[in-house]
Amino acid sequence: MSRKSVIQRNLKRISICDRLKSKREKLRAIIKDQSISMNDRFLAQVKLSKLPRDSSYIRIRNRCLITGRPRGCYRKFKVSRIVLRQLGSIGQIPGLTKSSW
C-alpha cells in the first residue's frame, strides 16, 4: 500500500487541476490562435507559466482508490488489478464474471 502522503498529494493535484482547468484551457487557446498579436500570445504564455505546476493534468497519476497502487490500475473500475480480482471473485463488482473457455 502506498504512503498516505503520496495518495493525498495526488488528490490535491486532482482538485487543483479541476479548479484551474478552464483558465488553463483559455490561455492555451490564446497561445495557439495565430490571429492574435504576438505580444498578447506572449503575455498569455507568461500567465500560463505562473499557474501552479500541479494544475496540469499530466501530473495526475491514476491510482487505485482502495490501496493507492500506482501501477496496474484499471481506469474503468479505478482499482488495481489485484483488488479487481479480489472484488470480482467475491461478486462485489456488478457485471464482472470469471471467463472460461
From Swiss-Prot:
Record GO cellular component, one term: cytoplasm
Keyword terms of this UniProt record: Ribonucleoprotein, Ribosomal protein, RNA-binding, rRNA-binding
Free-text function comment from the UniProt entry: Binds 16S rRNA, required for the assembly of 30S particles and may also be responsible for determining the conformation of the 16S rRNA at the A site.
PROSITE patterns: RIBOSOMAL_S14
Keyword Repressor: no
One GO biological process term: translation
Subunit organization: Part of the 30S ribosomal subunit. Contacts proteins S3 and S10.
Tagged with keyword Cell division: no
Pfam families: Ribosomal_S14
Alphabetized InterPro entries for the sequence: Ribosomal_uS14 (IPR001209), Ribosomal_uS14_bac/plastid (IPR023036), Ribosomal_uS14_CS (IPR018271)
Designated name of the protein: Small ribosomal subunit protein uS14
SUPFAM superfamilies for the chain: Glucocorticoid receptor-like (DNA-binding domain)
GO molecular function, one term: structural constituent of ribosome
Family the entry assigns: Belongs to the universal ribosomal protein uS14 family.
Superkingdom of the source species: Bacteria
